[in-house]
C-alpha cells in the first residue's frame, strides 16, 4: 500500500515496484506503460535502477516527470536525468515536466533525446497547445493564437462533454476549475469567476460562460484585445 494513497511513495520500495511491474505485465495482453518521477527524495534519485527494472519487466514505454516526489511541483524539472534514462534503456521514453511552449517542447526533445513529450498543466485551459507544438516541430513556425470565438466554442464543447460524463451535480463543480483555467488573464475574468463559482446548475453555468465570452467579443475577436495580464501556464492555483 502507499502512504496517503500516493503512488510516488512506491519509489521508496524498489522490490515492490518490481513485483508490481512483473505482475501487471504478466496479467494483461496489452502493452503496459509506466509513468513515474526521478525518485522520492532529492539526492536519492533511483530512476536509473527503476527504469532498467521496468524495461526488464516488459514495460512498453516509460513516461518520466523530471522531478522527485519531494519536489512536488516546486523547483524546475531536471531533464538531465531523463537524458540519462534515455541513454540507458531501449524502450520509448516520454519526457514530462514544465513543457509549456513550442520552443520548450523542441528543447526538451533535442536535449533529452526522448521519443515523445507529455504535457499536463500547460494544457489546462489551453488544449490547442498540442497543435501549436506539432506545427512548430514540423515547420519551425508559430500558429496564430485562437480567437475569442474559437475559445468560446472549445470551452462550451468541453463543458457539454464534461456535464455528460460527470452528471449534473459533479459536472457543475468539476467544470469550475476548467472554466477558471480557460479564462485566466482575460479582461474582467476575476469578477466573472467569482460570479461563476456561485452558480449551482450546469445550464446556468454554460449560460454565464457564453454571456461572458459574448461580452469579450463585443471588444474584439483577438486574444490580444482582451488579455490584461501575463498568464503563467504552469500556475494551476
Regions found by a protein language model. Give the residues of each.
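Glycine-rich tight-turn/loop motif centered on a GG-T
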Residues: 1-17, 67-78, 141
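N-terminal small/glycine-rich loop or linker at the start of catalytic domains
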Residues: 2-4, 24-33, 38
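Active-site glycine- and acidic-residue-rich loops that bind
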Residues: 11, 15, 31-49
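A cross-domain feature marking catalytic cores of carbohydrate-active enzymes
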Residues: 34-38, 66, 95-97, 121
Amino acid at each position: 500500500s502507499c502512504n496517503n494513497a500516493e503512488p510516488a511513495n512506491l519509489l521508496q520500495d524498489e522490490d515492490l515496484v518490481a513485483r508490481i511491474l512483473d505482475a501487471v505485465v504478466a496479467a494483461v495482453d496489452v502493452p503496459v506503460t509506466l509513468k513515474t518521477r526521478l525518485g522520492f527524495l532529492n539526492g536519492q534519485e533511483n530512476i536509473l535502477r527503476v527504469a532498467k527494472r521496468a524495461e526488464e519487466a516488459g514495460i512498453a514505454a516509460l513516461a518520466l516527470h523530471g522531478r522527485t516526489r519531494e519536489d512536488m511541483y516546486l523547483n524546475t524539472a531536471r531533464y538531465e536525468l531523463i537524458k540519462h534514462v534515455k541513454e540507458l534503456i531501449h524502450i520509448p521514453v516520454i519526457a514530462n515536466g514544465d513543457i509549456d511552449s513550442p520552443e520548450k517542447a523542441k528543447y526538451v526533445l533535442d536535449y533529452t533525446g526522448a521519443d515523445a513529450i507529455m504535457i499536463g498543466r500547460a494544457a489546462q485551459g489551453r488544449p490547442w497547445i498540442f497543435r501549436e507544438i506539432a506545427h512548430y516541430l514540423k515547420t519551425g513556425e508559430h500558429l496564430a493564437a485562437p480567437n475569442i470565438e474559437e475559445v468560446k466554442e472549445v470551452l462550451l464543447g468541453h463543458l457539454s462533454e464534461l456535464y455528460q460524463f460527470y452528471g449534473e451535480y459533479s459536472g457543475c463543480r468539476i467544470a469550475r476549475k476548467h472554466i477558471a483555467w480557460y479564462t485566466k488573464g482575460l479582461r474582467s475574468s476575476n469578477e466573472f469567476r467569482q460570479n461563476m463559482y456561485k452558480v449551482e446548475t450546469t445550464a446556468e453555468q454554460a449560460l454565464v460562460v457564453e454571456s461572458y465570452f459574448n461580452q469579450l467579443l463585443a471588444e474584439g475577436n483577438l486574444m490580444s484585445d482582451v488579455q490584461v495580464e501575463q498568464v503563467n501556464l504552469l500556475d494551476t492555483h
